[in-house]
């Protein structure tokens, strides 16, 4: 679970001193205090909130978060250079689309699904294309796209298969993933063994994928 302790208040400029004092006073009554990251300004200049940048032109991802995911994509592709294409495809696509597991949504695109700036997503898709070519990745890798992921999440999340919902995977689906991606023969393994191995795989993917949205505020 992710807890948010950021407070966003919209008010008239002339009310700022009074409201600011009232907030500090009320927090003290609760045994709380503000930290050094508080800021105020004119809303027309745009502002950052929970990893987003909101302005009159729309909602996008703040620059530092964009740079972080770009770096993460490049690091992953470099790391995958010597891996089989099936494993590369699996890792890269999970980073792009995220996934659903245990009723929870994981991934960068899920977290930033409220943006209106789709030009950023085209930029990320172009970056991946360039990185795959730069590092000589196997052309058989069928990578997914941020732009389509965005639209699937916003418009067809409960019916799409583009964004994996591992809660809907049958035991045979999980066997196929283990066989294709991890090259392990679980064709004769019992359900408990398959479920246990698959659960460990996804737990690791959750840890990896959550790194892209840590320290968002």
Regions found by a protein language model. Give the residues of each.
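Polymerase palm active-site segment centered on the conserved acidic dipeptide of motif C
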Residues: 1-3, 9-85
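Active-site and adjacent loop segments of nucleotide-processing enzymes
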Residues: 55-217
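Glycine-rich, often proline-containing surface loops adjacent to acidic residues and nearby aromatics
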Residues: 1-4, 48, 101-108
């Amino acid at each position: 679970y992710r807890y948010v302790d950021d407070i966003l208040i919209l008010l008239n400029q002339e009310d700022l001193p009074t409201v600011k004092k009232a907030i500090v006073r009320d927090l003290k009554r609760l045994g709380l205090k503000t930290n050094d990251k508080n800021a105020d300004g004119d809303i027309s200049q745009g502002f950052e909130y929970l990893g987003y940048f909101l302005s009159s032109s729309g909602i996008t991802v703040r620059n530092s978060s964009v740079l972080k995911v770009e770096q993460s994509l490049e690091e992953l592709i470099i790391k995958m250079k010597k891996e089989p294409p099936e494993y590369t495809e699996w890792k890269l696509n999970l980073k792009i689309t995220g996934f659903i597991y245990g009723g929870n949504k994981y991934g960068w695109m899920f977290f930033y699904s409220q943006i209106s700036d789709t030009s950023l997503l085209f930029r990320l898709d172009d970056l991946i294309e360039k990185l795959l070519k730069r590092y000589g990745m196997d052309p058989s890798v069928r990578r997914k796209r941020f732009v389509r992921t965005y639209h699937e999440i916003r418009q067809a999340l409960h019916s799409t298969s583009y964004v994996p919902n591992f809660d809907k995977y049958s035991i045979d689906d999980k066997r196929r993933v283990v066989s294709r991606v991890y090259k392990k023969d679980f064709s004769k393994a019992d359900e408990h063994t398959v479920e246990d191995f698959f659960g460990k795989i996804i737990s690791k993917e959750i840890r990896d994928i959550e790194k892209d949205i840590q320290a968002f505020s």
